[in-house]
Every structure is written in C-alpha cells, then in structure tokens.
C-alpha cells in the first residue's frame, strides 16, 4: 500500500535531488518502491499494489511558473502529485498485464 503523504508545507522544500517535497513523497516514493518490488510482485500468485490518492486530484491547476518556487502554491503540488500517482497506477497496471503478470495495481 503506497500511502505516504505530504500535504501543503508552508514553503517549498526540495529533496537533496532537487525534487519538490510533496512530489517526492506523494508520487516518486511509491513509484520507486513499486518498481523496486516489481520482481517479487511478479513472482507472487496474487500480488496487489494499492495507491491511496485523493479526490482533490480531479482539479489540477499547476502551471510551469509554479515549479520554480517563486510562485509556490502548496495545494497545487498536492493535487498534481496525487493525480500523477493515480496515472502511474493505471500505467503500471497496463505494463504488468501486458507482460502477462497477475499483479494488479
């Protein structure tokens, strides 16, 4: 279950890699964990990956001028990170199914 989450830090915080914290935790951490576990998931008879998203993802409004930190709006990063998480789940499910694995995302 990918359910790590950061919601609306008061200021833009970047990871050591320069990734905005909300995106790093809400999207990239679950994505990387799932990729790292893919081999084990593919060997399991009925593996499942659950991504916990948010209803807020239905209203993304991120523009590129908000990505540099000068016009930081935490809510927009939260919304788009959760949308990206849901989109990633759809794509990973397609990839696992196309490869003939029973993993459900």
What is the meaning of each model-derived region?
Residues 5-23, 42-102:
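Catalytic loop of short-chain dehydrogenase/reductase
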Residues 27-28:
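Ankyrin-repeat alpha-helix packing hotspot
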Residues 34-35, 90:
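A short, exposed helix-loop element centered on a Lys and neighboring polar residues
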Residues 105:
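A contiguous binding-surface segment within folded domains or other stable secondary-structure elements
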């Amino acid at each position: 279950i990918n359910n790590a989450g950061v919601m609306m830090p008061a200021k833009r915080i970047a990871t050591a890699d320069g990734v905005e914290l909300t995106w790093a935790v809400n999207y990239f951490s679950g994505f990387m964990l799932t990729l790292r576990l893919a081999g084990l998931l593919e060997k399991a008879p009925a593996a499942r990956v659950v991504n916990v998203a948010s209803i807020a993802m239905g209203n993304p409004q991120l523009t590129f001028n908000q990505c540099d930190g000068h016009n930081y709006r935490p809510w927009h990063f939260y919304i788009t990170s959760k949308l990206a998480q849901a989109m990633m789940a759809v794509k990973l499910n397609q990839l696992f199914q196309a490869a003939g694995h029973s993993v459900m995302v």
